[in-house]
A protein has these predicted regions:
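Active-site segments of SGNH/GDSL-like serine hydrolases
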Residues: 504-531
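Residues at alpha-helix caps and immediate loop-helix transition turns in enzyme cores, especially N-
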Residues: 156, 265, 296, 497-501, ...
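Structural recognition of the beta-strand scaffold that forms the well-ordered cores
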Residues: 45, 114, 436-438, 457-461, ...
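Extracellular/periplasmic envelope-modification machinery, especially enzymes
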Residues: 219, 259, 326-334, 344, ...
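Structured helix-beta-strand junction loops
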Residues: 116, 288, 307, 453, ...
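Periplasmic/luminal catalytic loop of GT-C fold multi-pass membrane glycosyltransferases
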Residues: 484-487, 496, 500-511
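Hydrophobic membrane-embedded alpha-helices
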Residues: 2-13, 19-403
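Short amphipathic alpha-helical segments and helix-helix/interface helices
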Residues: 13, 241, 301, 447, ...
Length: 581
């Protein structure tokens, strides 16, 4: 994600990186007005594909060949140290403030460090959009995995094409691979649609399905070389160059503001569109006659762009350990500002203290300079380095092991509380047909208390259940619950659409009484989901239990994930249900 300074430096590319990372940050902050901000990652892919391919081709042109060892060493030197720095600092922080995340963090770290995080998430069937509690703190490094695999294979393909077919065939090869990725994306996404699956991890995280942007950028890099373009062009050509950039930029903003994670076109169109719009912007801003490039070259944009890699690394971790109303209390806007400032501060520290010293060769120079010092000095320096590394490894190992042990004990207690029947409360009269109760893991957690107070005729709940699955379950169960009051929760596990909420209420519209519990999940979609639930509940005469309001200001109701309930929360939840019966 960093521009090598060996080729002509174009400030607007850093400005474009700033656009990408800001879009991703705003999306992960949970702002509903930028539902497609996650497509900033696809813009990063286009930029990386372009810059890396230009770097490779310039190297080949200068030396007549490609030193793969030097290339891979340079990539590791640029990307690895900031990642290691982030991981070590995060381990120290979460050992104190979020120990329940340590086990997953430690198990994910090797995959993050060695460029395989995306396939690890596919293997674990992690859905990028459906983590209702605290998501894995290294989940965002999936994109580093895709890029790392691109860095590994693309230079080899490039050399093969050059030797066998010549430079003229490279754009075709890049476009061919991009087309293969697009076909894989379509095939896998259609499979997901056909199966109505809740997990779409392969579509989002797979290198085969999500590398379109990288190879579109690579194809552009071969066919659109900045140093071969004329600085002086006629007005018509200049207008055309700028027009391409403006169209690409407006189109890109359109994907950010109009595409959302529930959009059925997400996997079929959004990724390729973001890549094509990114290419259009690059086509304009790398041209020396561009008047659009200065718009992306402001000092602020370049400052953010230069730190975009570190900002990307830090933003996800910081945002997930500082969730408003879960980890921190205070004014939402003040917390937004604070969290962004913390990310920028950490990114700046990373750039100055880690990235630049390594990138400039200062660290390497210090080690090479050892041989010119006296033997006593050499021994002291080597001993200091070895001792520091051992202390760092042993210290973080001890800290992480201690945090895992502490977290395991706490989670065992909470699991026992959630799974064991709670002391029965005073029974409540229910209708003759009993209760038909359905939903997700929150319903599973309250089933014993509700059963102790009421007559449950049917209960059907599952961890992670989304609206699409709930509709199918309701359709199957309603024949056996004709006379039952239906109680269900909605909106915890995914961003709802109007069609989904309408379909849910259509399935239960003939029940004697409809009770729906809204969501208090600490995700950006909560308020929008609750608004949809309230809207359709009013149309169908359903009773809404406003769990978001009831639980506000009561952190003692929740397990550490801020979603599932401990006994106090179970009682409050069931109290709200029985009050409506």
């Amino acid at each position: 994600m960093s521009t090598p300074r060996g080729i002509r430096y174009i400030p607007a590319i850093d400005g474009l990186r700033a656009v990408a990372v800001i879009a991703v940050m705003l999306y992960h902050l949970g702002f509903s007005w930028i539902p497609g901000g996650f497509l900033g990652v696809d813009l990063f892919f286009v930029i990386s594909g372009y810059v890396i391919t230009r770097l490779l081709l310039d190297s080949i042109q200068r030396s007549g060949g490609l030193d793969l060892r030097a290339f891979y060493k340079a990539r590791i030197r640029r990307l690895f140290p900031p990642l290691v720095f982030m991981i070590f600092v995060t381990i120290i922080y979460i050992s104190i403030w979020a120990p329940e995340t340590m086990r997953r963090f430690v198990s994910d770290s090797p995959f993050a460090l060695f460029g395989g995080m995306n396939w690890w998430l596919v293997f674990r069937q992690t859905d990028y959009f459906d983590s209702i509690s605290r998501p894995p703190l290294l989940q965002h490094t999936w994109s580093l995995g895709v890029e790392a695999q691109f860095y590994l294979i693309w230079p080899l393909i490039l050399l093969l094409v050059l030797r066998q077919f010549g430079k003229a065939k490279i754009p075709g090869a890049a476009l061919f691979i991009a087309a293969i990725s697009g076909i894989a994306l379509l095939l896998v996404s259609y499979e997901v649609d056909a199966a109505n699956a809740s997990q779409v991890s392969h579509v989002y995280f797979g290198t085969d399905t999500h590398s379109i942007g990288l190879f579109l950028g690579a194809a552009l890099a071969v066919s659109w070389v900045p140093q071969n373009l004329q600085e002086q062009v006629n007005r018509r050509a200049q207008d055309f160059i700028d027009g391409i950039g403006v169209i690409g930029f407006v189109g890109l903003l359109g994907t950010f503001f109009l595409i959302n994670e529930s959009d059925p076109t997400l996997y079929k169109l959004a990724f390729p569109l973001a890549g094509l719009f990114g290419c259009a912007i690059l086509t304009s801003i790398v041209h020396p006659a561009s008047r659009f490039a200065p718009m992306l070259s402001s000092k602020v944009a370049v400052w953010i762009g230069e730190r975009s890699y570190a900002i990307y690394l830090w933003h996800w971790v910081v945002f997930q350990v500082t969730r408003p109303a879960v980890d921190l209390e205070g004014s939402p806007w003040a917390l937004y500002a604070l969290r962004i400032l913390v990310v920028f501060a950490l990114a700046d520290i990373s750039l100055r203290l880690v990235e630049l010293p390594v990138r400039s060769g200062l660290v390497e120079y210090w080690f090479k300079g050892m041989k010119y010092r006296t033997k006593n000095v050499q021994r002291r320096q080597k001993s200091t380095v070895v001792a520091s590394i051992l202390l760092l490894i042993l210290g973080t190992s001890y800290i992480s092991a201690n945090a895992i042990s502490q977290s395991d004990k706490e989670m065992a207690i909470i699991k026992q509380q959630l799974e064991q029947p709670i002391q029965p409360s005073e029974p409540t009269a229910t209708q003759e047909g009993g209760l038909w109760v359905t939903g997700d893991s929150v319903i599973l957690g309250i089933r014993y208390e509700l059963d102790a107070r009421s007559n449950i005729a049917i209960i059907n709940a599952r961890v992670g259940r989304q609206a699409t699955e709930l509709i199918e379950v309701m359709r199957a169960d309603k024949a056996n619950a004709a006379d039952s009051t239906v109680i269900f929760n909605l909106g915890n596990n995914n961003k709802l659409t109007s069609d989904q909420v309408l379909a849910v209420f259509e399935e239960v519209k003939n029940q004697p009484k409809i009770i729906v519990v809204n969501t208090a999940v600490p995700r950006g979609w909560r308020d929008e989901n609750n608004a949809l639930i309230a809207q359709y509940a009013a149309l169908y005469g359903a009773t809404v239990i406003d769990w978001a309001s009831i639980s506000a200001g009561h952190p003692e109701y929740f397990a550490p994930d801020g979603v599932h309930l401990v006994p106090a929360g179970v009682r409050a939840y069931v109290d709200a249900i029985t009050a409506t019966l």
